[in-house]
């Protein structure tokens, strides 16, 4: 069974990177993607591989909806470009990246203001700091950005404890902006601490980092808070797992963060998952052999990923038994 390592350029810098790489392979029931970010250690990357095994061998739970509303994704770009991106997306909800290293709060305010103007008063707007603010910075920034009627602020600070304190401080100041937890759920030993400590109002769930669609469904049930399904900047193969999760959740009160395929300048399927009128269809994908060849990583990059896969597979007992693949 062949393993494909892809290397695709991004349309703009995102999360500090300009290219996205990962591994694709076909299992008994379908194609799978494994694309943990390079800085993640092997143990963290193992959860991503468990998700890939699920994609390849189990398929998806029964959907309860055939369309997933999604948000436009706005990187830390200039206000004019931010407006253009939202307009082109056709989405009624937008997520704006803030707290980018090297940028100022004033730049964040200008970007968010431009997006709010583009969306109009009825559009929904959320910001994502990726833990980029200290507690004090988060209080000031969210109080300032609250003027734009935020749906929520995602992962303003890194630690769960800071999120708890932040919610308290904002409440005392009369700043009514809900807090969403992302990294505090997917990059910690106990994702339920967010629930137990009252650290967030909304849970962000990402399939690969959390070990698969079924694991996310179980987690959503015990977290007992509204859920937003987001992507990990994958190709359409990986995005399809996020769509499967969003389609299977009993309730879906928010637009999902699954429109990130628009950040890639290429893809590996015949019809990439892209929003139409602000939504993604729950549909099967066909991997394109020509696209696999076109996006194939160079030898050095491919070697790095295959060596990494070899190490991480040793931590995932399901790998050889369920895929029939020995590394």
What is each residue range found by the language model?
Residues 31, 229, 255-258, 281-282:
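Conserved active-site loop/cleft motifs that coordinate metal ions or position small ligands
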Residues 6-8, 73, 182, 230, ...:
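Conserved beta-strand termini and adjacent loop/short-helix elements that scaffold enzyme active sites
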Residues 101-244, 265-268, 273:
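Catalytic core of soluble alpha/beta enzymes
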Residues 92-94, 202, 226-227, 253:
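Hydrophobic beta-strand segments of well-ordered beta-sheets in folded domains
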């Amino acid at each position: 069974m062949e393993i494909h390592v892809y290397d695709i350029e991004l349309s703009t810098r995102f999360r500090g990177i300009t290219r996205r790489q990962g591994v694709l392979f076909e299992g008994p029931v379908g194609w799978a993607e494994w694309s943990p970010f390079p800085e993640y250690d092997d143990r963290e990357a193992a959860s991503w591989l468990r998700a890939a095994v699920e994609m390849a061998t189990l398929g998806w739970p029964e959907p309860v909806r055939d369309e997933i509303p999604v948000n436009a994704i706005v990187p830390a770009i200039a206000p004019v470009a931010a407006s253009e991106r939202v307009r082109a997306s056709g989405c009624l909800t937008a997520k704006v990246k803030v707290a980018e290293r090297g940028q100022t709060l004033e730049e964040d305010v200008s970007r968010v203001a431009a997006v709010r103007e583009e969306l109009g008063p009825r559009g929904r707007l959320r910001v994502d700091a990726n833990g980029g603010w200290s507690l004090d910075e988060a209080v000031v920034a969210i109080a300032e950005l609250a003027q734009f009627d935020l749906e929520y602020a995602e992962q303003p600070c890194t630690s769960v404890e800071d999120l708890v304190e932040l919610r308290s401080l904002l409440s005392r100041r009369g700043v009514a902006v809900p807090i969403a937890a992302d990294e505090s759920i997917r990059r910690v030993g106990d994702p339920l601490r967010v629930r137990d400590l009252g650290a967030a109002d909304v849970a962000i769930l990402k399939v690969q980092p959390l070990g698969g669609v079924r694991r996310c469904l179980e987690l959503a049930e015990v977290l007992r808070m509204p859920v937003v399904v987001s992507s990990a900047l994958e190709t359409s193969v990986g995005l399809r797992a996020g769509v499967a999760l969003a389609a299977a959740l009993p309730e879906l009160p928010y637009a999902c963060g699954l429109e990130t395929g628009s950040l890639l300048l290429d893809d590996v399927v015949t019809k990439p998952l892209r929003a139409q009128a602000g939504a993604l269809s729950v549909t099967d994908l066909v991997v394109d052999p020509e696209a696999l060849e076109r996006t194939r990583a160079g030898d050095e990059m491919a070697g790095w990923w295959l060596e990494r896969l070899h190490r991480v597979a040793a931590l995932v007992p399901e790998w050889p038994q369920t895929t029939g693949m020995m590394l």
